[in-house]
Design a protein with these regions (language model features):
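Positively charged n-region of N-terminal signal peptides that target proteins for export
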Residues: 1-9
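Acidic, low-complexity intrinsically disordered segments
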Residues: 14, 18-160
């Protein structure tokens, strides 16, 4: 009985390691903010980064969701050198409605059809100013992967 249990536990342990082995090549997206508490009128800066270079993309996009009664986007820019390839272009956009939610798109693409490389490190910086309507209930900012072919399992991030 002990031997059977030992074999089953060993098999279970090996099976549980399989996703980690295959996920080792998947890049990790991270978001950081420069403040942990925000009051009306405060400015916060959100930085979006990835830990591994991603090659052979036609396009990529993250969406930063936030309550527009709580924050106003005051600036946003892609990090110089975050993309490489022939005919690449990208931007940190203005407010858009995505399926009924307010968001800002951070995106890039190839205008020539040549592959785009998204380089490891800082991708974009976005600055927000908290409005007088900010509360604990509406202060959440959420970053989601909207378009990143072959990496649809990339973990999304919440900034609270």
């Amino acid at each position: 009985m002990k031997r059977t249990l030992s074999i089953l536990l060993t098999i279970a342990m090996i099976i549980s390691l399989i996703p980690a082995v295959f996920a080792a090549d998947v890049p990790t997206m991270s978001t950081t903010v420069d403040k942990t508490e925000v009051q009306p009128g405060d400015t916060i800066t959100l930085t979006l980064s990835i830990d591994k270079t991603i090659t052979n993309l036609n396009n990529w996009e993250w969406a930063i969701y936030f309550d527009k009664t709580a924050y106003v986007k005051t600036s946003g820019e892609l990090e110089p050198g975050c993309m490489s390839g022939t005919g690449t272009t990208g931007a940190v956009g203005d407010n858009v409605d995505i399926l009924g939610k307010n968001a800002i798109r951070v995106s890039g693409l190839s205008t020539t059809g040549d592959p785009v490389t998204l380089n490891a490190g800082k991708i974009a910086t976005v600055t927000f100013t908290a409005t007088e309507n900010i509360t604990a209930e509406n202060a959440r900012i959420e970053v989601k992967t909207e378009a990143l072919p072959d990496y649809d399992t990339l973990k999304d991030n919440d900034v609270k």
